Each structure stands twice: as structure tokens, then as C-alpha cells.
Amino acid sequence: MNQQTITLAVAAMNAVHDTERNLDKYARFVAEAAAKDARLLVLPEQSLQGYLYHLNHALSPEEMNYHYDHAEPVPGPSTERVAALAREANMYIVFGMTEKVAVSSAGVLYNSAVLVGPEGLIGVYRKVHAPGDEYHVFRQGKDWPVFDTEIGCLGLHICYDLRFPEAARELALKGAQIIILPTAWPQNVGAQYDLFDRARAAENECWFLSSNQVGTCDQGQLTYYGHSRIIGPLGNIVADTGEDEGLATAEVPRDRLRRRQWGTLNIFRDRRPETYTSLASEDIYHALGPTETESL
């Protein structure tokens, strides 16, 4: 193993609504990444139990029951199994799941991204921005944690968070050197994904890893875009899975991973936060008025 470089990996995965089958696929991706000496593997949003059947539809009692019945706590049985894979492979793994928090008799569900590593469970991020029918299933998170690891400081956000540049910027300002995005991004809006993930890497001058679901959902009508990617600090795509299920990897010099690539322009030095007075205002939406949103 080259101590001067580190290998990063992202998976494009056709997740199903069957936790055991998805865990089996996790194990195969971990083995493939480990064979390439990867130290970090990112798996998609909701890839443990499966995502919503659709984004804008009438949720059936059967679907609601599925999400509640298959949700798990963190830590829990599945996080322990993935943590065991991480220990065995000496790897950091990020994966998306439906998390259940016992604050009531039924529990509260979150769309969460979990980080495990050789040392076990490291942390969890709960999705802050909820699109479409996620409002009816998941409670929204309230913060943007970053996690210091042996390979650098990692910041997590999920799917729809990508549409909000403040999310990645908050992670970068907190010290994230690698910004990670598990996602279930639909195929029909792939052009936006192509734009946003490269922009977030470039505007924060850090590495950006996105892991997307791919193919058609086994329940409902959603088809996912794939194109899980490793993107450099200049917004350049270093590795891409394309439209098929699989793994993309990149070997990166450690000194390029652990520091931002300052050039002539230093965006963090040159920021003028005192002028961005509308960013934290809760009244702007009401002033602009609601708009029609595209059906996904």
C-alpha cells in the first residue's frame, strides 16, 4: 500500500426494498473496494432499506408500514454489521438508511447517513432538507456535523441538500476536507445533478464524493441517474460509474486530500459574510411567494 496516496471509492447501487439483499450487496462492494486498497467507500441514500416508491404520490398504508417496520436505530443490527465490514477492511464507510429514534410509541423516522470506520460507529447525519413526500415519512435534521477521521475531516449531506449551496458551504466552513453526498437522484433531472455536484466541489475547493442509486426501483416508478462520482477541488470529475451499477475509485495524493488547493483566489479569505444579510431570513419565501415545482 502506498502511504503517499489514498484510494477513494463510490458505489452506484440498485437498492431494493429488502434489507438483507442490500446488506449482501454492501459486502460485495466493500470486498471490491478493499481489493483496490480503498480507505473510504460511499454508498447511496436509503440503500439499506430502499427509498420511497415515488417522490410525489399518495402514500399507501402498506408503504408507510414498510418504512416504519424496517427502520432501525443507530447503533443497531445493520450498523453493527456494516461496522464489522469496515473493521475487517480497515475502511471508512458511509451509507444511507431509514433511522428510527424512540421518542414516541411509534418512533420517529429520519433519512440518515451513517459513518462507520475501523473504530466502529463514528456518527450519523440526518437529512435537513426534505423534498416531496419525504415530509410525510421523515422528520428533518437540524445540524451539519463534521467528523474527524484518520483520512481527514468528513462532512455529510444527502440528496436534496445538494440544491442548497449553503449546506456544502457550512460543512466546508466547519473544516470538511471531503464532502460526501449519498443520494437517490432521479434520472429525469440528471442535468441538475451534473451541475450541482461539480459546483459544490469547486466553490468550496474540496473533494466531493457522490454515491447515487441506479436503475429502476423495484417498487413504484422511480428510475435513478447513477453516475456516482469522485470530483476534485477544481470541479473536475476524476472517476464516474456511468449509468450502470458498479464502483468507481480514484487514488489521490494525501497532501492534496488534506488541504485546500489555494490558488491566486482564496474564496474563504475573500468571503464577505456581513453582506449576505438575507441568507438567514425566514421571511424571504413568503415575500417571493410559492412557486410551482416540477413533478419528479
Predicted regions and their residues:
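N-terminal active-site segment of His-dependent metallophosphoesterases
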Residues: M1-L40, I180
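C-terminal beta-strand edge segments of enzyme domains
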Residues: V146, Q213-L296
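Amphipathic beta-strand/beta-sheet edge segments enriched in Tyr/Trp
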Residues: A106-K127, L222-G242
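Cys-nucleophile CN-hydrolase/nitrilase-fold catalytic domain and related Cys-dependent amidase chemistry
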Residues: T19, R28-P118, P186-R200
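Active-site-proximal beta-strand elements of phosphoester/diester hydrolases
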Residues: T5-H17, S112, V124-K127, C153-D161, ...
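Conserved beta-strand and immediately adjacent loop positions that scaffold enzyme active sites
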Residues: T7, V94, S112, D143, ...
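Active-site beta-loop-alpha substructure in enzyme catalytic cores
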Residues: A34-L43, G132-N204, F208-S211, P290-L296
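CN hydrolase (nitrilase-like) catalytic-core segments centered on the catalytic cysteine
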Residues: A71-V94, L162-A248
